[in-house]
């Protein structure tokens, strides 16, 4: 991984040590090149790259699709429950190092079922790792994402296959999402499967307004009726939409280094996060696919603080937003925010 490094300022150091939540992380996107090669060897999978360095050199993306092509190739090494456990535990270690005390994690079952790996195998491995993480003080939820470049019929079949798992793991597997290639695949394409998930009382999220237009965010809100919008950075192009997001407190799970790496913005100083924050939108900072985009949660905070010249109060608000927007009980939310406040305002609020 080519890590984005910024010399920590006192605010960055305070942020690094602060308890945080991550709300936009694709577990398959945390698969580092070293682990890809280790799993390939363990499982006898032939990779298109002859070395870790050659694979890392291929991480030169021009847009979302060029990233997705290599992302799916990397996931090909995941075959057995232990593989999903190992991948998830590696992410957990990164969270613990970054003081991420709560994470809501996406996984893409269709990436695996099309290779003959049952959803139950995927979830069992991830769940076992997340149960171990809880013993170390990190809580988590799991969100099943549909691949939007595939058909809604495929998504509906995936949802039906996963129904027993939503019951078996109801403490953890609490929602559905929508990811993969955004262009040409509007949220409206998945209205039926989201209605089924909503009828079960599941939480709903969707990627919208990363490469897609503001109209995709409206569709996510009005047709899918999402609880959170993933990315959403192009909402700034529609003032009425920004006002609606701010008034409704529907959070945006923003991923700054991902946006930079995928050329959503050609420079982090041009990122819309601060403008959205200034207008009252509940923005959060997340890593997306950290193994591919050069940074886990703290690296995203450091780069964003530096590029957008965020101040103490703004960073506190962003971190607090991550807890406010999380899918936990009100009691858990209060506990999480209390931990943040104890760190951020050790002598009490000013």
UniProtKB/Swiss-Prot annotation:
Protein name: Adenine deaminase
Annotated site residue numbers, Important for catalytic activity: 231
First-tier enzyme category under EC: hydrolase
Alphabetical keyword list: Hydrolase, Metal-binding, Nucleotide metabolism, Zinc
Gene3D superfamilies in the record: Metal-dependent hydrolases (3.20.20.140)
Database matches in InterPro entries: A_deaminase_dom, ADE, Ado/ade_deaminase, Metal_Hydrolase
GO molecular-function terms, A-Z: adenine deaminase activity; zinc ion binding
